[in-house]
Regions:
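Extended effector regions of multi-domain proteins
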Residues: 1, 15, 76-93, 116-118, ...
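Exposed beta-strand-loop-beta-strand "reactive/processing" segments of non-cytosolic proteins
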Residues: 26-77, 122-176, 233, 364
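Hydrophobic or amphipathic alpha-helical targeting/insertion segments
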Residues: 66-99, 103-113
Length: 629
C-alpha cells in the first residue's frame, strides 16, 4: 500500500528505507538493535496547514556494547533530524534477543542438570519464555545490566499443552547483552503436574457442532476503504498501526446534517500491564508491561476469515521492523467488517403501528498473542454516534505447580497440583478528543438525591451535580457506581440548540482497581493504575502512561510525573486517559483455554446532536411481509 496521507502507517518499503538511512546517518553497526521504529506523527498544526509533510520515523536504538538507548528522527529521504542518548533508559526486548537468550539457557549445563534432577533429560521438550525481570532484581545483579528471566514448562509430546506441566521453582536469569546466564533459581521440590490439558481439535474432537452460520451481503459491505481511510454510514476515520500500541484510530468525524464534525484526533490503548497477585516462586515477578516492555504491534496475529472475523471482510496488512533491521509484513493484521447489532430503536404506538430499526456497527479489530495470553482490541462505531472500545481476553491462564490440595490462597487449583495465580489485566486508553474541533474541558457528573423534604417531598427525586475538572490534580478520579459517576468532554465554545455546551461522555464499563500496594515495586512502576481517569494538556512527548521506557524502570514516570505540575485543563487541547480492566480469579472453567472475558468503555454523544442520529437510519426490508417496520 503506497503512502497517501501523513498519518498512514509506515509501509514495508518505507521502513526499509528508514533502516538503511539510519545505519548510514548514525553509523550503526551489528551491535546496534532497532528496538522500535514508529511513525513520527505530524502535529495537529502541521496537518491543518495542508503543506507537504516529510515522512518521518521515530527510531529507538539499543547499543548492546554501551548498554544505552538512543532516539532519533529520520525521514524516508534520509534527512536525520536528531539523534540523542536517553540516560538511564532500557529498550524493550526484541524477538531476536529473546531467541538468543533462550539458546543461551538451553546450552547452560547448570540448567540441564537442574532439569535432569526433575527427570527431564531432553531439553528440547522444555518450553521456556522470556519475561522482563521488572525491578525485582537480585541485589548482586542490580548493576544496570538488562535482564530477563525464563519460566519453564515441560512438553512431553510435540502437540502437548505445555502449560499443563509447569516446572516450578526453576528460572534462569539472563544478561541479554552479555548473552550469559547470570543466575539460576532452583528452589522448589514440587513435582511437575502430569494431567494433560488438551485443547487442539485433533485432541478434543469438538463434539458439539451447530449448523453453519453464513453472513452474506450480496451488494458488498456498506463501508468504503481508500488506503487507510474508512467511511461508513456517517462516520469517517483513519486506521493506524504502531509497533508499540498496535491498532490506532485517527481523525474521527461524524457527518451531522451534511457537515462533518470532529470527535477525536487519536485513540489508542497506550499501556497494558498484568500484575500477578501470587507471592509464590514463578509468579511474583510476573508484572509485564505488554505494551511498553514488549511492543504489542510485534505480536499481532494474521487474522483468518471465518475464525477471527466473520462476514464481508476487508483486511489491512501492517509492517514492523525487527531488532536486526529486517522488516516483516503481518498479513491481515487488521480486520474490518460490519455486524448486525440487534434493535437500534423501536416503538409500538397505541394504535398498533410499529416502527423499528435494526442496528449495525462497524468493527475495526486486531488480536495479539503475548506468550500465554491473547488480547483482541475491538473498536466499534455505532449509528447513534457512539463509539465503544472492547478488549477481549482469551488464551491460556499462566500456570504454576504446587502440591495437590495445598493451601495456596492466591491461586486456583485447575487440576491436581496445577494452579493458576490470581492476576489483573489493567489497560490505559489514551484519547486525544477534539469535540467539534478546538479546545475542550472536562466535567464530572454525579447523580444525587436530596433528603426527604421540600426538594424531595416523595423521596424519589434526584438531580445531577456537574463539576468542571479545572486542573490535573482535580481530574485524578475514580469510578463511583453509587453516584452513577461519569465524565463529559465538552466544547465550552459551542452551544447546542438549547444553550448547553456540546459534548461526549465517557462511560466506564467493566473495570477494577489495582490490589498491589502503591509503595510496592509494581505500584511505583505502574502508578497510573491508581486512578480510573487522568486528564492532561496535550503535549506531544507525553505518550505513554508509565513513561517511554518502563523496562526495569524503578517507577514514577509517566502520568504521576507529568501531573505534578498541576496544569490547567480549562478550554484547552486535552488528552483523556482512562484506566480499566479485570480482576481475574481463575476458574476451573478457564482451563485449558479461557473463554473470552471482556472489558472496555463507551464514548456517547451528550448534547452533541440536536436529536438522535439514529432517526436517520432507514427502515429495513421486513422478512415477514405482514409486518411493517
Amino acid at each position: 500500500m503506497s503512502f497517501e496521507h501523513p498519518l498512514d502507517p509506515l509501509s514495508h518499503a518505507e521502513q526499509e528505507q528508514i533502516v538503511a538511512h539510519a545505519r548510514k546517518a548514525w553509523n550503526l553497526e551489528a551491535h546496534h538493535l532497532f528496538a522500535m521504529l514508529q511513525l513520527h506523527e505530524p502535529t495537529k498544526g502541521e496537518l491543518a496547514a495542508g503543506k507537504k509533510i516529510d515522512r518521518t520515523a521515530r527510531v529507538t536504538i539499543w547499543d548492546r556494547k554501551k548498554a544505552t538507548v538512543s532516539e532519533g528522527l529520520i525521514t524516508t529521504d534520509g534527512v536525520a533530524k536528531e539523534y540523542k542518548e536517553i540516560p538511564g533508559a532500557k529498550s524493550p526486548v526484541s524477538a531476536i534477543e529473546s531467541a538468543i537468550a533462550l539458546d543461551v539457557v538451553c546450552r547452560n549445563q547448570s540448567v540441564k542438570d537442574a532439569l535432569a534432577r526433575r527427570g527431564i533429560d531432553d531439553i528440547t521438550t522444555v518450553h521456556m519464555e522470556t519475561w522482563p525481570i521488572g525491578a525485582q532484581i537480585p541485589a548482586h545483579l542490580d548493576d544496570g545490566r538488562r535482564l530477563i528471566w525464563t519460566p519453564m514448562w515441560h512438553q512431553p509430546t510435540p502437540d502437548a499443552n505445555f502449560y499443563a506441566h509447569p516446572i516450578h521453582g526453576l528460572h534462569a536469569i539472563v544478561d541479554i547483552d552479555a548473552e550469559e546466564v547470570v543466575g539460576l533459581e532452583d528452589n522448589a521440590d514440587v513435582p511437575i503436574p502430569q494431567t494433560p490439558g488438551p485443547y487442539r481439535e485433533s485432541q478434543t474432537g469438538g463434539t458439539v457442532a451447530l449448523k453453519e452460520l453464513m453472513i452474506h451481503q450480496p451488494d458488498g459491505p456498506s463501508f468504503d476503504v481508500q488506503g487507510w481511510n474508512i467511511k461508513w454510514e456517517r462516520w469517517s476515520f483513519r486506521i493506524g498501526f504502531d509497533q508499540r500500541e498496535g491498532l490506532v484510530i485517527h481523525d474521527v468525524n461524524f457527518t451531522d446534517e451534511g457537515t462533518p464534525r470532529k470527535i477525536a484526533h487519536r485513540l489508542s490503548i497506550a499501556e497494558l500491564v498484568i500484575p500477578y497477585g501470587d507471592p509464590a516462586q514463578g509468579a511474583y515477578r510476573k508484572n509485564a508491561f505488554d505494551t511498553g516492555e514488549f511492543g504489542l504491534g510485534n505480536f499481532t496475529n494474521s487474522l483468518t476469515l471465518g475464525c477471527d472475523c466473520l462476514g464481508e471482510i476487508v483486511y489491512l496488512d501492517a509492517a514492523v521492523t525487527e531488532g536486526d533491521g529486517t522488516v516483516r509484513t503481518i498479513k491481515n493484521a487488521i480486520c474490518m467488517h460490519e455486524e448486525d447489532f440487534g434493535i437500534l430503536w423501536k416503538h409500538v404506538d397505541v394504535d398498533g403501528h410499529t416502527e423499528v430499526r435494526r442496528g449495525r456497527r462497524f468493527v475495526a479489530s486486531s488480536i495479539v498473542t503475548v506468550n500465554n495470553y491473547e488480547y483482541g482490541y475491538f473498536w466499534y462505531f455505532y449509528q447513534d454516534g457512539s463509539i465503544e472500545f472492547e478488549a477481549k481476553l482469551t488464551g491460556i491462564v499462566l500456570t504454576l505447580a504446587d502440591k495437590p490440595g495445598a493451601h495456596h490462597p492466591s491461586a486456583t487449583e485447575l487440576e491436581p497440583g496445577l494452579w493458576a495465580p490470581y492476576h489483573q489485566h489493567i489497560l490505559c486508553a489514551r484519547m486525544d478528543l477534539e469535540i467539534d474541533g478546538g479546545n475542550n474541558s472536562v466535567v464530572e457528573i454525579e447523580s444525587f438525591a436530596h433528603p426527604v423534604g421540600e426538594k424531595n417531598p416523595y423521596g424519589g427525586a434526584y438531580e445531577t451535580r456537574e463539576t468542571v475538572l479545572k486542573s490535573e490534580s482535580a481530574a485524578q478520579r475514580l469510578v463511583d457506581p453509587i453516584k452513577s459517576r461519569f465524565w463529559k468532554v465538552i466544547n465550552p465554545n459551542k452551544k447546542n440548540h438549547v444553550g448547553h455546551s456540546i459534548g461526549y461522555k465517557l462511560i466506564p464499563g467493566h473495570t477494577t482497581y489495582p490490589l498491589a500496594h502503591r509503595d510496592s515495586v509494581l505500584g511505583k512502576r505502574a502508578g497510573f493504575m491508581y486512578n480510573h481517569l487522568w486528564v492532561t494538556p496535550n503535549v506531544e512527548s507525553e505518550r505513554y502512561p508509565a513513561g517511554d521506557y518502563p523496562f526495569q524502570h524503578e517507577g514514577g514516570a509517566g502520568l504521576p510525573e507529568w501531573t505534578k505540575n498541576n496544569r490547567s485543563l480549562e478550554n484547552t487541547d486535552i488528552v483523556l486517559w482512562h484506566v480499566f480492566g479485570t480482576n481475574h480469579i481463575p476458574r476451573t472453567e478457564d482451563w485449558p483455554v479461557m473463554p473470552v472475558e471482556r472489558t472496555g468503555f463507551h464514548l456517547k454523544p451528550t448534547g452533541f446532536f440536536r436529536r438522535s442520529p439514529a432517526m436517520d437510519v432507514a427502515a429495513s426490508a421486513a422478512v415477514d411481509t405482514s409486518c411493517d417496520c
